[in-house]
Amino acid sequence: CNNFYASCERMFAPDLNGRPVVVLSNNDGCIIARSDEAKALGLKMGDAYFQQAAFLRQNNVAVFSSNLELYGDMSTRVMNTLKSYSPVTEVYSIDESFMDFTGINPATLRDFGLEIVQRVKKNTGIPISLGIAPTKTLAKIASKLCKQYPKLAGCCYMHRPEDIEKVLRRFPIGDVWGIGRRFEKKLLAANVATAYDFTQLSPEWVRLNMGGITALRMWKELRGEACIGFEDMPQPKQQIR
């Protein structure tokens, strides 16, 4: 889901479309969700509300306290819509899930994905980014591309090796699912700046320097080998983008 908490608030206040929106933590201490317009203003996740209050007023930013009951209800609606398209759908977090499209004609996957994006929007009002790829790690990257390139209309289907390589050559290593800040620093120190650079490392280096099997799975996934099952995925980040 795109900017999930902010999108939920907009569902019940259509006049907010096009206006910057932020959602605060339970005690109104800091920003935990931002609309694209709020991001464009330079507002960051974790910004203290009291430090940004004047700036928010000056820029006509709509500010909401967290409404977890609302977000939970909207999440259920989104996930139920997704499950109607795949019998194997695993909810990963309140605003994210993985779906298994095994058995669907690859030639129709792009149109199938667009149909899902449009149906979720119609049923719930929530915009989503759907990444389709040979592995979960690549699908996460494809989903990020949807948010960067509006012309994709919410669905990015990566399957040709040459296209995947082009994307990985431009994709920062720190943005790869499961890397984390500690490994990002280690990889940058080893001149590994992109996801593609990471795929060019030897499996021995990955195993020795990054803690064994989990990192090796990530390396294999980026190389197109599906090896992260639904039952052994990394834990999601706590904050909602």
Regions found by a protein language model. Name each.
Residues 8-10, 33-36, 138-146, 211, ...:
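Short acidic, glycine/serine/threonine-rich loops at helix termini
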